Amino acid sequence: MAELIEEVSTATHASLNACDPIVVNSEALPMQALYQLSATGAQQQNQQIPIGLSNSLLYQQLAAHQQIAAQQHQQQLAVSAAHQTQNNIMLATSAPSLINHMENSTDGKVKDDPNSDYDLQLSIQQQLAAAAQAAQMGQTQIGPQIVGQQGQPVVATTAGSTNGSAAVTQPDPSTSSGPDGPKRLHVSNIPFRFRDPDLKTMFEKFGVVSDVEIIFNERGSKGFGFVTMERPQDAERARQELHGSMIEGRKIEVNCATARVHSKKVKPTGGILDQMNPLMAQSALAAQAQMNRALLLRSPLVAQSLLGRGAALIPGMQQPAFQLQAALAGNPLAQLQGQPLLFNAAALQTNALQQSAFGMDPAAVQAALLANEQARFQLAAAAAQGRIPSSGNASAFGEQYLSNALATASLPSYQMNPALRTLNRFTPY
């Protein structure tokens, strides 16, 4: 304070001597130089514009007023925070009574809650902790949180600071779903003669049966099935009554069926593409028979022997020619196995006519029939001359060695048992 008075007196003395030029020259110059030095240092340090002594007094007064206003504002904030905390505590205290009042007004009865005191104390402690944390973080609290009886927080939001009414939101109990009872039953160890109507009759006395399914395989019933009932209560009663009962000497087991598990096995598509289709199997057998017949007819000796014995060649013409070509192309040994033994031109011409007959050409069919008749007469005449092979009778060469094997070779070389099993397969469905 003394330093401030000295500065004021010095400034007054300097202002009084400012009118005298002599005094200005003698006394004001050292003061002005000192002031300039101090102003230059202040400018270098704070980078601010220098001010006079009179302005510094005003600046100090303004700073003091600002500090006082800031302190008053902080006090007001502290008072408002205390009022807010008190209101929150009062609201938390009155919330359980408000809830009980609402329940009493709805039911018309007074419900005593033994855990209300403990919940109230716990909610007050939580509110105090939340208020302290909000005061530290500098955030205003929107509304209190009330902990319910089940340990789930129930948010209470204030509609406004004037009315003070609170709207309490509680979780909806209808959203919680409980497990339903069993409806589908698994029945095992049933008699093998049982069918769906028998199993349905056994369960109809307990309630309405919506579906019955007994599992079968190729040999018949597998001895178990599934029963689906309309109501879970009926299914449970049927399970309790029938489980362990004896039917035709077999102990019936009834249990709750688990969820169906669909296998990832790829099922073949039905129709022509199915290899187990009877029509497809018959077509494959016909193609195999035609290929075997064509391989046999490539040899002139075998062809003439078959014609002499009256082997039918016309049924082989009923299959289209492209099937024969596809079958021959699929067999790489067909050309090696079917190399004809060229003994004369007549046999080669007969073979060519027979091959052209497979194409369903009418002219080729007539030529094949004519060649068949001619060859039959020739073989009948040659048989009367004797069976000693010679160079002049090349058509009968080797016939005495092949007479026993030609009858078997004329038949198609495929097995009939797989075809019969395919056609006569038992399907219980």
From Swiss-Prot:
Transmembrane segments: none
Native species: Caenorhabditis elegans
Subcellular location: Nucleus
Coiled-coil segments: none
Entry function: RNA-binding protein that regulates tissue-specific alternative splicing events by binding to 5'-UGCAUG-3' and 5'-GCACG-3' elements. Also binds to poly(A), poly(G), poly(C), or poly(U) stretches of RNA. Plays a role in the sex determination pathway and X chromosome dosage compensation, and together with sex-1 is involved in making the distinction between one and two X-chromosomes.
BP terms from Gene Ontology: cell differentiation; dosage compensation by hypoactivation of X chromosome; mating behavior; mRNA alternative trans-splicing; mRNA metabolic process; negative regulation of gene expression; nervous system development; primary sex determination
Reported tissue expression: In males and hermaphrodites expressed in a subset of cells in the head and tail. Expressed in the pharynx, intestine and in muscles from the vulva and body wall.
Protein name in UniProt: Sex determination protein fox-1
Keywords: Differentiation, Nucleus, RNA-binding, Sexual differentiation, Transcription, Transcription regulation
PROSITE patterns: RRM (PS50102)
